[in-house]
Amino acid sequence: MGDREQLLQRARLAEQAERYDDMASAMKAVTELNEPLSNEDRNLLSVAYKNVVGARRSSWRVISSIEQKTMADGNEKKLEKVKAYREKIEKELETVCNDVLALLDKFLIKNCNDFQYESKVFYLKMKGDYYRYLAEVASGEKKNSVVEASEAAYKEAFEISKEHMQPTHPIRLGLALNFSVFYYEIQNAPEQACLLAKQAFDDAIAELDTLNEDSYKDSTLIMQLLRDNLTLWTSDQQDEEAGEGN
């Protein structure tokens, strides 16, 4: 059994044990062998890092909320400790994101040929996602540059997906979902977010008969998430409009 197969086996085992740091480390090593990733390999890489970064994002949100409360309480001593801990989590999160972005630029996006539309969109979406995660914790000039990089990656992926993929394709739908979240949460542009999500949902509904049996479950799940977000976002906007005259 070659190195590559051993690493993949370790990644699958780590996934079953829910040891995502180990899983990410194995998939990073697989990627650095600089051979094309199969769909399964690609998904292993994505799942590993999504869980690794997800744990840090969740911790960061909890600590940020404690920091806000501590600030309001005026407890300076505690605030210093909380702030230092938030910064520690931030550094971990940034390291994970930068690892993924380096793999994408050095190997994955770079090695896609002109006809590997699905892989290209998958990796560009991933690039948009990890710059978005950096944007969640960044501020000032640093935030501006990661926001721009995130939008550029999403836009490039979006153009390729519109030209070469069915509206019901789960990767195209997943991209629309995350790109619309980027507009809503990072750019604070609810109208643009709703427009993008609604267009993606409507386009998919219009071509439901093209739904691939293999991806039916994935596609319909993402369509449901798009619809849930639209419901939430439009009710938020209505609440704001209703409250504007108060």
Curated annotation (Swiss-Prot):
Keywords for this protein: Acetylation, Cytoplasm, Phosphoprotein
Intracellular or extracellular location(s): Cytoplasm
Pfam families: 14-3-3
Modified residue annotations for Phosphoserine: 25, 59
One GO MF term attached to the UniProt entry: protein heterodimerization activity
GO biological process, one term: regulation of mitotic nuclear division
Modification N-acetylglycine occurs at: 2
Coiled-coil residue windows: none
Location (main, coarse): cytoplasm
GO CC terms of this entry: cerebellar granule cell to Purkinje cell synapse; cytoplasm; cytosol; glutamatergic synapse; intercalated disc; mitochondrion; plasma membrane; presynapse
Domain of life of the native organism: Eukaryota
PTM info: Phosphorylated on Ser-59 by protein kinase C delta type catalytic subunit in a sphingosine-dependent fashion.
Record site feature (Interaction with phosphoserine on interacting protein), residues: 57, 132
Family: Belongs to the 14-3-3 family.
Subunit and partners: Homodimer. Interacts with many nuclear hormone receptors and cofactors including AR, ESR1, ESR2, MC2R, NR3C1, NRIP1, PPARBP and THRA. Interacts with ABL1 (phosphorylated form); the interaction retains it in the cytoplasm. Weakly interacts with CDKN1B. Interacts with ARHGEF28 and CDK16. Interacts with KCNK18 in a phosphorylation-dependent manner. Interacts with SAMSN1. Interacts with the 'Ser-241' phosphorylated form of PDPK1. Interacts with the 'Thr-369' phosphorylated form of DAPK2. Interacts with PI4KB, TBC1D22A and TBC1D22B. Interacts with SLITRK1. Interacts with MEFV.
Function: Adapter protein implicated in the regulation of a large spectrum of both general and specialized signaling pathways. Binds to a large number of partners, usually by recognition of a phosphoserine or phosphothreonine motif. Binding generally results in the modulation of the activity of the binding partner. Negatively regulates the kinase activity of PDPK1.
The protein, known as: 14-3-3 protein eta
